[in-house]
């Protein structure tokens, strides 16, 4: 009487939620957040590294980011990487630091960010549905092999479906929250 590992399914669904949270955290809203610079990578010491491995990122003011670069020789590379990151940011070099003013988001940019958030949520939902499918396939196989009975298979299948529904509604809730945050002027 085994069936499938419901804890493994829950863990994988939680992983999809965490990946989604990480994706939407990097979307720029009206407020400054150090996460905005998460997608920025720098050519440093012979490889591409995330910005947070060569500098401290701070939020000194609501519409300003500060980047304190540890290695003076990296200032130009960091400046270039931020400018080329398609985030629409223009850093101001101040010695070994960069100040990055965050411009107001116009309506068009807000709508495109909401669209990107929807794409991230769809990607997360697809991942969750794959986990559900794997679980259901495991149940069918276990039932076919005689490892579990039809009743237990149905019971576990209902649990997997409930987990799926709960996880997808959590994604929808997080998306609605982020959408509201982006559209707020």
Curated annotation (Swiss-Prot):
GO terms for biological process: cytoplasmic translational termination. It is found in: Cytoplasm. Pfam families: RRF (PF01765). One of its GO terms (molecular function) is ribosomal large subunit binding. GO terms for cellular component: cytosol. Residues 137-166 are annotated as: Disordered. Keywords: Cytoplasm, Protein biosynthesis. Belongs to the RRF family. Responsible for the release of ribosomes from messenger RNA at the termination of protein biosynthesis. May increase the efficiency of translation by recycling ribosomes from one round of translation to another. This is Ribosome-recycling factor. It comes from Agrobacterium fabrum (strain C58 / ATCC 33970) (Agrobacterium tumefaciens (strain C58)). The lineage of its organism: Bacteria, Pseudomonadati, Pseudomonadota, Alphaproteobacteria, Hyphomicrobiales.
